């Protein structure tokens, strides 16, 4: 069997690098491809493994080689979660899982998304990049799980990774134990079109550090300038310049016209049907829930149901009040870091001189984080929880110190601790105040329906996209679609519309359709 024949069986792209990898494992590949086990159980797979995955030592494996050899991602995660953006996967569910001992997740990231808060990670994330990163993260988290440091973790697929290797990536993901969360599509558009964003990075000299506050900055005035909304679309406001403010890509108020951008951005929204088809070969048992199952009093019982189904800890009765909270209210305001330097004046001190924000100030500051009880770090590193030292505006808040070294520095600086206590108290009140302000800016589903009434072409686009997005529900759970109050209103609005003509494009923009 030649290398070219092996590549043909595994659909491996011919390149010098891939050929070298195949040659390195050729003595294992040939007998495996000739075995009865391969012919019976694997030969019909679209991307069959080129060596026996059952005999693989994942911890000692090279992720780049594993990708070329079509080896499944290590299935050490407890379960898989998939769904669109704005169904709760990036806010509420992270917190609710953390309260049940599921404190970490691994995520696939669309092209252009950042794995970490560093400028170096702002490059495109291809299918192979995602595979290799997730491979490493799963191995790392499994070691923490085996050591007892964490109890459970999951794999989240809420970004759709689109490139030439999309089918391969998803075929190598085990989705045999899966949770799928769905929501009324009109509510999804309402959510993403009025989604507040907060600055994530702060430029200090030539470097970037996580965004945070300093003792001399008024918490009631400063960070409100760093909360903004995405306001760009393909047919409306296409000439906006990058930046924040009226007439730019970002603004301090949401714009219903951004619904168009989200509607057409199926890497993040409305890709449930595509994801369902991509994962279908390994999907065996889908636990289907709606966003509304995790709101108010229903949430606690829903999490008990998921705990029993997936085998993680049931929520504690003493935490029931937390499951009735709106996690999204503080999602984009926390965690908030306080850089506390002993020479910095408190913002309330009269006639004090504000220090220069530079590397020295940041590096020598004690880092205190105001977060919420939904932060998984509280349960993984409880020794960093110093909430009991503070008077907070709401019991949902919690306070973390970055390290034991910072804790020792704080114990030796009683004057600084006094300043920090005052600041954190005020900051918690400021965050609650800002959350209320942002809530007044929220759009409503009727705003989305009115927008669709104004733009018939967008109704045609929505109807076209929903054929794909609602595939699973239409096939297996049509009663859920029938229960979508606002989507049913959309159907009434669009009942006389002509089907979308793909050949005509969209206001000068070409339309392409990706099929799997």
Regions found by a protein language model. Name each.
Residues 2-74:
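Non-catalytic propeptide/linker segments at domain boundaries
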Residues 278-418, 424-426, 431-434, 438-444:
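The conserved 3'-phosphoadenosine-5'-phosphosulfate
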């Amino acid at each position: 069997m030649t290398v070219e024949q092996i590549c043909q069986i595994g659909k491996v792209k011919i390149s010098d690098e891939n050929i070298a990898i195949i040659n390195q494992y050729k003595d294992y590949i040939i007998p495996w491809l000739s075995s009865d086990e391969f012919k019976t159980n694997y030969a019909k797979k679209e991307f069959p493994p080129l060596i026996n995955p059952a005999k693989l030592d994942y911890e000692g494996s090279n992720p780049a080689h594993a990708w070329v050899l079509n080896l499944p991602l290590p299935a050490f995660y407890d379960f898989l979660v998939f769904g669109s953006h704005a169904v709760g996967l990036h806010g509420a569910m992270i917190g609710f899982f953390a309260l049940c001992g599921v404190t970490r997740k691994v995520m696939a990231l669309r092209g252009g998304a950042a794995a970490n808060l560093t400028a170096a990670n702002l490059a495109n994330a291809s299918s192979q990049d995602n595979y290799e990163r997730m491979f490493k993260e799963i191995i790392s988290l499994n070691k923490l799980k085996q050591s007892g440091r964490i109890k459970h973790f999951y794999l989240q697929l809420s970004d759709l990774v689109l490139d030439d290797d999309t089918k391969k990536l998803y075929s190598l993901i085990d989705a045999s134990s899966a949770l799928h969360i769905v929501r009324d599509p009109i509510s999804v558009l309402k959510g993403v079109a009025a989604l507040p964003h907060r600055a994530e990075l702060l430029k200090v000299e030539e470097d970037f550090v996580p965004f945070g506050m300093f003792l001399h900055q008024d918490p009631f005035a400063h960070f409100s300038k760093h909360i903004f909304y995405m306001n760009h679309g393909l047919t409306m406001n296409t000439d906006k310049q990058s930046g924040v403010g009226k007439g730019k890509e970002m603004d301090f108020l949401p714009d219903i016209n951004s619904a168009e951008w989200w509607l057409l951005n199926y890497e993040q929204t409305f890709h449930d049907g595509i994801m369902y088809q991509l994962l279908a070969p390994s999907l065996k048992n889908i636990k289907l829930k709606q966003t509304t199952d995790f709101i108010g009093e229903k949430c606690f019982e829903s999490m008990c149901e998921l705990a029993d189904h997936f085998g993680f800890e049931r929520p504690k009765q003493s935490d029931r009040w937390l499951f009735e909270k709106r996690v999204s209210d503080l999602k984009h305001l926390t965690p908030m870091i306080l850089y506390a330097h002993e020479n910095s004046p408190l913002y309330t001190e009269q006639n004090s001189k504000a220090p220069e924000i530079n590397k020295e100030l940041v590096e020598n500051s004690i880092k205190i984080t105001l977060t919420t009880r939904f932060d998984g770090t509280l349960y993984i590193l409880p020794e960093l929880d110093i909430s009991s030292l503070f008077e907070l505006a709401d019991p949902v808040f919690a306070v973390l110190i970055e390290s034991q070294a910072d804790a020792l520095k704080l114990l030796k600086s009683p004057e600084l601790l006094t300043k920090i206590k005052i600041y954190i108290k005020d900051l918690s009140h400021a965050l609650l105040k800002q959350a209320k302000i942002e809530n007044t800016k929220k759009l409503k589903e009727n705003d989305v329906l009115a927008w669709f009434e104004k733009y018939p072409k967008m109704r045609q686009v929505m109807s076209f996209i929903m054929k794909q997005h609602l595939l699973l529900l239409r096939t297996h759970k049509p009663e859920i679609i029938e229960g979508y109050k606002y989507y049913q209103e959309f159907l009434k609005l669009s009942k006389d519309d002509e089907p979308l003509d793909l050949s005509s494009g969209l206001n000068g923009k070409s339309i392409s359709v990706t099929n799997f």
